[in-house]
Amino acid sequence: MSLQNLTRFPRLELIGAPTPLEYLPRLSDHLGREIFIKRDDTTPLAMGGNKLRKLEFLAADALREGADTLITAGAIQSNHVRQTAAVAAKLGLHCVALLENPIGTGAENYLSNGNRLLLDLFNTQVEMCDALTNPAEQLDELATRIEAQGYRPYVIPVGGSNALGALGYVESALEIAQQCEGAVEISSVVVASGSAGTHAGLAVGLEQLMPQAELIGVTVSRSVADQLPKVVALQQAVANSLELQAKADITLWDDYFAPGYGTPNEEGMAAVKLLAQLEGILLDPVYTGKAMAGLIDGITQKRFKDEGPILFVHTGGAPALFAYHPHL
């Protein structure tokens, strides 16, 4: 089915050529299964990552509205905030970031290195809060305060995950389908599932373009019971915006995020080291390390529906390695 309605939405060309889809020969040999990787860690701005796909749509909407300031929120080591700040710098916009310390650490590297260091390089106005208990409300309050200072703010939700931002991953599904056509028939796709926009966009796009592929979201912050409504709500909102039906079930694995968001665990760090040592590719402790841990354990435990090739969607995050180096 066509995704032609995507073209109705304004989009900034921030990424350019499709990101690579590569075969991982040494990891495949190690796991006894064909593993491919979609390299969204190589998007061209600010050390890469998946949020740039969402920001192509969100920043275009901000410019359409005449905004001169992008406001968003996340953890101190948020990849999304880092990429939003970079886009703001590229477009000549002010950026205000509302940050929390979700793991309650006083470690200097977490507080000032990695993504947080890059925010300073992008001249981001950083506001700290005790916790993002109601980020939508907190962002609206911040926007009101910034507007009173004479700015024209545009609020971008946590992770860039709303129906507009998630269109970036419908676009990514189109890229994946085109790259796989005539080359490989993927049986399963694995992606980290956090703020839910990436997962929901892929769910809508892959249902239309690669319905044979099983999509698995490995949660990085919530149980299935808490995450499922978020993904389903966004999946339906994205489908509605494109005048599509979204009937595919959402599959989530929540066995790999403990002890919680932003806190590394043993299996996640083992996955980070494994991919670095076998393929020279950097994962991160918060998202992709835990998602890869799910992929590895899923093969071991025979959790996948069949034994065909698996595609891992690499959403980026390597700058956070410098904030977590004691765990390495």
Curated annotation (Swiss-Prot):
Q: Which Gene3D superfamilies match?
A: 3.40.50.1100
One GO term under biological process is: D-amino acid metabolic process
InterPro entries, from UniProt?
A: ACCD_DCysDesulf, D-Cys_desShydrase, D_Cys_desulphydr_bac, TrpB-like_PALP, TrpB-like_PALP_sf
Q: Which residues carry this modification: N6-(pyridoxal phosphate)lysine?
A: 51
> Pfam families this protein is in?
PALP
Which CDD domains does its entry note? ACCD
Instruction: Enumerate the UniProt keywords alphabetically.
Output: Lyase, Pyridoxal phosphate
Q: Which gene encodes it?
A: dcyD
* Reaction(s) catalysed by this chain's protein: D-cysteine + H2O = hydrogen sulfide + pyruvate + NH4(+) + H(+)
What is the required cofactor set for this protein?
pyridoxal 5'-phosphate
Q: Which SUPFAM superfamilies match?
A: Tryptophan synthase beta subunit-like PLP-dependent enzymes (SSF53686)
Q: Does the keyword Lyase apply?
A: yes
Q: State how it assembles.
A: Homodimer.
| Name recorded for this polypeptide | D-cysteine desulfhydrase
Question: Per the similarity annotation, which family is this?
Answer: Belongs to the ACC deaminase/D-cysteine desulfhydrase family.
Its source organism is Klebsiella pneumoniae (strain 342)
Lineage summary: Bacteria, Pseudomonadati, Pseudomonadota, Gammaproteobacteria, Enterobacterales
Asked if the Swiss-Prot or TrEMBL record annotates the protein with the keyword Lyase, the reply is yes
PANTHER family the record matches: 1-AMINOCYCLOPROPANE-1-CARBOXYLATE DEAMINASE-RELATED
Q: One MF term in GO for this entry? A: D-cysteine desulfhydrase activity
Q: EC?
A: 4.4.1.15
Instruction: Give the protein's biological function.
Output: Catalyzes the alpha,beta-elimination reaction of D-cysteine and of several D-cysteine derivatives. It could be a defense mechanism against D-cysteine.
